[in-house]
């Protein structure tokens, strides 16, 4: 009888060590830690659950009544300061920024096109070439001659040479 018990335990151990196919039937082997799913199917289910939780939270938030805005936003009162009686002007100080303090651009701000060639508008991605004039170019327009670069390479070169080779002038020798 003792040998029959050993045979049954060895049979269940051999069954447990055999790999099981994915429950979804994709053809890959599943793991008990992943609910007998393969890693790809398990990741998909986890992603769906996370998306569902986010959507559920968004729906609950939209149904939740928001308190009136007047409770949170209090308008700052205007402060009137009267200077000495010599001046007849009244100064009004407000907490709101004045229009002269904030500069307004006449043109609407456009996002910088750092991933496109300035000449042909071709997408360059990571292979874009940054020129010294500050623009990004494709492989065809990367040279200064091909895109009419406004950067003065000669002047910069002259400046670097002058900096690297300072003029050394010795004092004049005095004769007796």
Curated annotation (Swiss-Prot):
Gene3D superfamilies: 1.20.5.4770, AN1-like Zinc finger (4.10.1110.10). It holds the Pfam family zf-A20. PROSITE patterns: ZF_A20, ZF_AN1. Zn(2+) 1 binds at residues 22, 26, 38, 41. GO terms for biological process: defense response to other organism; proteasome-mediated ubiquitin-dependent protein catabolic process. Zn(2+) 2 binds at residues 117, 120, 138, 141. A zinc finger (AN1-type) spans 111-157. Zn(2+) 3 binds at residues 131, 133, 147, 149. It comes from the Eukaryota. Keywords: Metal-binding, Zinc, Zinc-finger. SUPFAM superfamilies: AN1-like Zinc finger, Glucocorticoid receptor-like (DNA-binding domain). GO terms for molecular function: DNA binding; ubiquitin protein ligase activity; zinc ion binding. A zinc finger (A20-type) spans 16-50. May be involved in environmental stress response. This is Zinc finger A20 and AN1 domain-containing stress-associated protein 9. It comes from Arabidopsis thaliana (Mouse-ear cress).
């Amino acid at each position: 009888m003792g040998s029959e018990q050993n045979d049954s335990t060895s049979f269940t151990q051999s069954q447990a060590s055999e790999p099981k196919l994915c429950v979804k039937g994709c053809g890959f082997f599943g793991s008990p830690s992943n609910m007998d799913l393969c890693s790809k199917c398990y990741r998909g289910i986890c992603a769906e659950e996370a998306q569902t939780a986010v959507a559920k939270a968004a729906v609950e938030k939209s149904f939740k009544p928001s308190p009136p805005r007047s409770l949170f936003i209090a308008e700052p009162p205007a402060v009137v300061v009267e200077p000495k009686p010599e001046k007849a002007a009244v100064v009004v100080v407000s907490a709101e920024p004045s229009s002269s303090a904030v500069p307004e651009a006449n043109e609407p701000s456009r996002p910088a096109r750092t991933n496109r060639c300035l000449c042909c508008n071709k997408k360059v991605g990571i292979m874009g070439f940054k020129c010294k004039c500050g623009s990004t170019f494709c492989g065809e327009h990367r040279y200064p001659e091909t895109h009419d670069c406004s950067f003065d390479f000669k002047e910069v070169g002259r400046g670097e040479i002058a900096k690297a080779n300072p003029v050394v002038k010795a004092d004049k020798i005095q004769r007796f």
